[in-house]
Every structure is written in C-alpha cells, then in structure tokens.
Amino acid sequence: MKESQLILNIRKYLATIPGCFYWKEHGGQYGTAGIPDIIVCHKGKFIALEAKVGRNQPTRLQAATIELIRRAGGVAAVVRSVDEVKEIMQTI
C-alpha cells in the first residue's frame, strides 16, 4: 500500500466520527515542512498523524515536529494502519 492510500483510508475513517474535524496537510512548496500528514481536532484535543508504510520512517524534521506537538500537550504519532488511528481516537 502507498502512503497516499493509507492517508485516504484514515480520512475515510475520521469522517465517520461525529464532531471530528480534520484536514490533510499538503506538503511541497506551499506547505510547511515537517508538519504531519493529517491534523485532527476532536473533543478539544489536537491530534497530528504522520502516515508511514512498510519500513518508511519519519524524517528528522517530522520526528522533531511530533515531539514539539507532544510537549505542547497535543497527541502526535506515526501511524501505519487505520487500526492504529482507531486506538488513538478511542483514547480521546
């Protein structure tokens, strides 16, 4: 599976959660480097999800951003499946 397909599957899942606001962060020239793929707000909690497949790992900048989000009180994670996202969302 490609990361783009995983992101699509995660977005489809998030769309089923009442009151869940989310958006796909777009990289490239007009995006902000290091920002996780999907940003979520649910029940007042900030959640950042970086999708990776296979053995792919976050870049140093992505890992640093995830750590900054956690230090600020948000939830941030590298996710490899919709099931992992479900586990995170069930803790909110």
Per-segment meaning from a language model:
Residues M1-I92:
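Catalytic phosphate/metal-binding cores of nucleic-acid and nucleotide-processing enzymes, i.e., regions
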